[in-house]
């Protein structure tokens, strides 16, 4: 690749979170892109595609601890970050692709409806820019950094190889591996039906008001696991087309999606051989 790509990075865990730093490390190691960060100045998990409609937001250039081309912190949601980046900061020189994450925790199944990580990627696609949302199942400490550099580069090149706007957004989940287990390849899947259901937990009651925590949740799974969930359980990295309608099967037949899966496998194998 003669000319380096222009890559915009964001997340919902905050600009100085471990996950986005790991993503920067991998991209620097691959050395095929100039990196720009526009991310929230505080954690914005669960923001989905919300944006600051009723109040102003600020953006401030910050010193970042890794050699990126520039980094800005935003006092708003992940979608605010994308709106400011594409609508002002880089309006005259748009990025080739937006990468969001790496999120601390899974964003598989219907959880993507809540995810600020996925929300930022969807905002990019809606705005005409290819995007990938990355999440690490369970905890960011499970991420296998030594094995991820070429995988992330391949996924970026795959997303850029797709004709816009057909399936140019993707939601990637890395499985959690234990006891020296390794990732067992990548698989293109449809977004699963599983979701995390939380029961409100009462914190206190002062007689006038009750205070609750809504962060207690667990993944609910049917006996008939989705392909996405089954792939993660068998330690495969899942790559799900990221659409506002949430499922590629609403736009194509099952046979057409199976053909897309085969094309994805062929692309990955050709990149590994090259």
Swiss-Prot record:
Keywords: Cytoplasm, Hydrolase, Metal-binding, Nucleotide-binding
Localization terms from the record: Cytoplasm
One GO location term (cellular component): cytoplasm
Cofactor note: Binds 1 divalent metal cation per subunit.
UniProt GO molecular function: 3'-nucleotidase activity; 5'-nucleotidase activity; exopolyphosphatase activity; metal ion binding; nucleotide binding
InterPro entries reported in the protein's UniProt record: SurE, SurE-like_Pase/nucleotidase, SurE-like_sf
Signal peptide: none
Reaction(s) catalysed by this chain's protein: a ribonucleoside 5'-phosphate + H2O = a ribonucleoside + phosphate
Enzyme class: hydrolase
Any one Pfam family match given in the protein's UniProt record, by short name: SurE
Superkingdom assignment: Bacteria
Co-factor requirement: a divalent metal cation
Gene3D superfamilies xrefs: Survival protein SurE-like phosphatase/nucleotidase
Function in brief: Nucleotidase that shows phosphatase activity on nucleoside 5'-monophosphates.
Family matches, as HAMAP family: SurE
NCBIfam families, per database record: PRK00346.2-3, surE
Protein name: 5'-nucleotidase SurE
Organism listed in the record: Chlamydia felis (strain Fe/C-56) (Chlamydophila felis)
């Amino acid at each position: 690749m003669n000319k380096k790509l222009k890559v915009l990075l964001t997340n919902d865990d905050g600009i100085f979170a471990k996950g986005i730093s790991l993503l920067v490390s991998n991209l620097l190691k691959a050395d095929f892109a100039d990196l720009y960060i526009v991310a929230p100045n505080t954690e914005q998990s669960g923001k989905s595609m919300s944006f600051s409609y009723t109040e102003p937001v600020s953006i401030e250039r910050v010193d970042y601890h890794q050699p990126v081309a520039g980094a800005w912190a935003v006092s708003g949601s992940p979608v605010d970050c994308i709106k400011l980046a594409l609508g002002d900061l880089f309006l005259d020189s748009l990025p080739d692709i937006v990468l969001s994450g790496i999120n601390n925790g899974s964003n598989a199944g219907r959880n993507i409806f809540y995810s600020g990580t996925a929300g930022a990627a969807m905002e990019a696609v809606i705005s005409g820019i290819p995007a990938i949302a990355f999440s690490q199942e369970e905890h960011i400490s499970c991420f296998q950094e030594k094995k991820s550099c070429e995988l992330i580069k391949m996924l970026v090149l795959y997303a850029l190889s797709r004709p816009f706007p057909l399936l140019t957004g993707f939601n990637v989940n890395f499985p959690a591996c234990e006891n020296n287990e390794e990732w067992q390849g990548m698989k293109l899947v449809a977004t699963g039906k599983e979701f995390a259901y939380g029961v409100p937990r009462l914190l206190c009651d002062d007689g006038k008001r009750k205070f609750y925590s809504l962060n207690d949740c667990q993944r609910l799974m049917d006996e008939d696991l989705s392909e996405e969930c089954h792939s993660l359980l068998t330690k495969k990295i899942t790559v799900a087309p990221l659409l506002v309608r949430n499922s590629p099967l609403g736009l194509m037949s099952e046979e057409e999606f199976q053909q897309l899966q085969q094309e994805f496998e062929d692309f990955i194998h050709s990149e590994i051989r090259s």
